[in-house]
Amino acid sequence: SDDKKAKAATSSVLTKFTQNQIQEMKEAFTMIDQNRDGLIDVSDLKEMYSNLGTAPQDSVLQAMVKEAPQMNFTGFLSLFSEKMSGTDPEETLRNAFQMFDSDNTGYIPEEYMKDLLENMGDNFSKDEVRQTWKEAPIAGGKVDYNAFVSKIKGKEQDDA
C-alpha cells in the first residue's frame, strides 16, 4: 500500500542522519514552517524571508517548492539527504546558511545568524555563540558565512 511505501521511505531517509541531525532538521523545519501546520509551502517561505528582511520573487519561491508544493518533514529530510549525500559537514553547514541567503550574497544578517545558532538545539550555548562571535567575520552587521563555517570547522580540528 502507499502507506507502507511512505513509511519505508521515511525510515530509509531517517537512517541517513544521526539523531542529532534529525533533531536539528526538525528545528530548522519548524523555523520555516511559519504557520505550524506541519507543511512547508510558498507562504511559509515568504514569511520566513520577510522575517529575514528579503522578499524573493514568487517565481523563485515557486521554484524552491516545485518538487514538493506541500512539503512535510520527511520530504524536507529527503531534500536534504539528496543535497547532503557524500557532502562533508562543512558543506552541509554552508548549504544550510545559503538557504537563508536568497540573493546569494555570501552574507547573512548578524542578528539572524545569532538566532540561528542559538536556536539550533543544544549545539551552541549562549557562551559558545559569544565566544565564536568574537572571531566571526562580521562587516556592517552582516556575517560572511563561508568564512564563518571555515572558522568553526577549523576550531573543531584544533580541539581534536
Swiss-Prot record:
This is Myosin regulatory light chain, smooth muscle. The modification Blocked amino end (Ser) is found at S1. Pfam families: EF-hand_7. Ca(2+) binds at D33, N35, D37, D44. One of its GO terms (cellular component) is myosin complex. This chain binds calcium. The modification Phosphoserine is found at S11. Keywords: Calcium, Metal-binding, Motor protein, Muscle protein, Myosin, Phosphoprotein, Repeat. It comes from the Eukaryota. The lineage of its organism: Eukaryota, Metazoa, Spiralia, Lophotrochozoa, Mollusca. GO terms for molecular function: calcium ion binding. Residues 20-55, 88-123 form the EF-hand domain. In molluscan muscle, calcium regulation is associated with myosin rather than with actin. Muscle myosin contains two types of light chains: the catalytic light chain, essential for ATPase activity, and the regulatory light chain, a calcium-binding protein responsible for Ca(2+) dependent binding and Ca(2+) dependent Mg-ATPase activity.
